[in-house]
């Protein structure tokens, strides 16, 4: 290939990348009510039952709803990005074959995988932000600190990207006929060992379980958001959460992109 042709391809790659991303955003915009119903229903009921019903019945301590809310936002962000990457990839690689159109685009295969991650992360950002008006509607108020906004934004972005990287890994490495089993084996432990319902430092009396939670990326999203929104509650240090999320993001991205390229070649 000549030098000018190579330069043209490099110049056009960002434009093609943005065009593919915009196409996905446009499709989601047309189906926004359905998308929101899919991703918000579960955290909405968790917030309602654990934050409102149990509180009104006296089964939780006063203020538990404000402790719970950052964890529910974290759960919504990470699970939405994970599912928004994994499930479409399984369908596109095995049934609809829609991924073949993307692979024909004049951009590196790795960038197609990155586009999938970024698009899923954007969907997760929308879902996480929507939890604030829902929280106000259900709880009457939600914790928010202007001083904690930068930390919250950093943790949120790292959390949705880590979740989409996890989804990329699952969607490319798990066989299509095993994806439902994989989700059953992954999502339930992810949900209950991610410190979304309880602060990590309070698990001192259950040391073995406290150690187990460290292997769940959701733990660091929950703790980081808790530190940003309700700093008076025991929580991990912000730098620990950021460092851990960067590690999980890098690890799952490397594995997921490798798996994506392998599936694309096959």
Describe these PLM feature segments.
Residues 45-50, 65-138, 185-186, 191:
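Hydrophobic alpha-helical transmembrane segments of multi-pass membrane transport proteins
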Residues 29, 33, 52-62:
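Short, hydrophobic transmembrane alpha-helix segments
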Residues 2-7, 229-233, 243-266:
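Junction motif at the cytosolic side of a transmembrane helix
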Residues 142-143, 195-251:
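Membrane-interfacial helix-loop-helix junctions in multi-pass membrane proteins
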Residues 54, 171-215:
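Transmembrane helix segments
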Residues 2-42:
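Aromatic- and glycine-rich beta-strand/loop motifs that create alpha-glucan
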Residues 109, 113-185, 235-257:
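Alpha-helical transmembrane segments and their short interhelical loops
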């Amino acid at each position: 290939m000549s030098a000018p042709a190579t330069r043209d391809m490099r110049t056009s790659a960002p434009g093609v990348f943005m065009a593919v991303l915009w196409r996905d955003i446009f499709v989601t915009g047309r189906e926004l009510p359905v998308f929101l119903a899919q991703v918000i229903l579960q955290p909405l009921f968790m917030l309602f039952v654990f934050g409102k019903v149990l509180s009104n019945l006296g089964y939780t301590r006063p203020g538990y709803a404000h402790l719970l809310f950052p964890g529910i936002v974290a759960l919504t962000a990470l699970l939405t990005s994970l599912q928004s990457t994994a499930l479409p990839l399984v369908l596109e690689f095995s049934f609809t074959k829609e991924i073949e159109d993307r692979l024909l685009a004049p951009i590196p295969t790795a960038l197609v995988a990155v586009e999938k991650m970024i698009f899923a992360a954007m969907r997760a950002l929308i879902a996480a932000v929507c939890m604030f008006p829902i929280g106000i509607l259900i709880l009457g108020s939600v914790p928010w600190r202007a001083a904690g906004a930068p930390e919250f934004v950093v943790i949120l972005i790292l959390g949705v990207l880590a979740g989409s990287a996890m989804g990329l890994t699952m969607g490319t490495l798990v066989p299509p006929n095993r994806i439902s089993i994989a989700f059953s084996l992954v999502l339930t432990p992810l949900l209950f060992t991610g410190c979304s319902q309880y602060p990590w430092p309070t698990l001192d009396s259950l040391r073995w379980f406290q150690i187990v939670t460290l292997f769940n990326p959701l733990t660091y999203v929950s703790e980081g958001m808790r530190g940003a929104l309700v700093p008076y509650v025991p929580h991990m240090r912000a730098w620990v959460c950021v460092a851990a999320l960067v590690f999980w993001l890098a690890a799952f991205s490397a594995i997921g992109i490798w798996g994506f390229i392998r599936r694309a070649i096959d």
